[in-house]
Amino acid sequence: VISCSSYRQAARQLGVSHTTVMRMAERLGRHCLLFQQRYLNGIGQLEEPVAVDGFETFEFSQYTPVHLNVAVGARTHFVYGFTDSELRRKGRMTQAQRARRAFLERTFGRPDPRAIEKEIAELLRLLPDGRVELRTDEHLAYPRAVRRSARIVRHTVTSSKSARTPRNPLFPVNLWDLLIRHSSSNHKRETIAFSKRRQNAAEKLAVLQVWRNFLKSFSEKKQDATPAMRLGLLERKLSVDEVLQARLFITRIGLPVRLQRYYFRETVTRRIPNGRTHDCTLAF
């Protein structure tokens, strides 16, 4: 899931059906949502600035772009969470492409123009308690999202044109965007392994999030502490076996309502209105 292999590539290597790999990835995504939340529930107060940005990708086709809104700790690089926002296709288009976009919007509906504002507000509510020192670029939806969230926020803005060096206040979230692009086959430029549903993209991102926070060193060269260690949640790195050693249940871990939509697979793709949900009786 995090090695930049598509489901079919992984299936060929393992000698199984690609649907088997897909089902296991879905289950792993649900587990990682709960695993992350179990540690987040133990954080008392937010004690570091948080950098927030929107990672742009798409679902089903390039006519349906999506923002994965992510929040990263400025000092620890701990990934606190994510939400998603449907977007309207923008940028330069031919007349035929504009006509195609218009047809799709008449048929399936048009994305909410305030989707980023609403989902950034949801993301802010997912953060631990306390005053939020928020760092973002100059996107106009962010100040509105701050007001909508009802959190106490100190908001500072950095130009998206500033050099993306370690001195940039948004460096932690820019680095996370880079790692997502680097480690995920569904987000590569001009890929044919793109996510058909953003629900699947969210599940893969949940796995990548746990890997980044609990298994990966802050620095690959130094092989030092993980973000979770820097945040004080753990004293050592975890292994894959330790992450998977016990089954986790949503009835025993307080998963926020916004994240429950990912857990139960309720994130709907307009072009696939009957996408599979997670409603197995024995799963609870």
What are the language-model segments listed below?
Residues V1-F284:
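Residue-level recognition of single "structural anchor" positions
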